[in-house]
Amino acid sequence: GLISNLGI
């Protein structure tokens, strides 16, 4: 997901 892609 987006969160994972941001590394957060």
Swiss-Prot record:
GO terms for cellular component: extracellular region. Expressed by the skin glands. Its main location: secreted. It is found in: Secreted. The keyword Secreted applies. Keywords: Secreted. This is Dynastin-5.
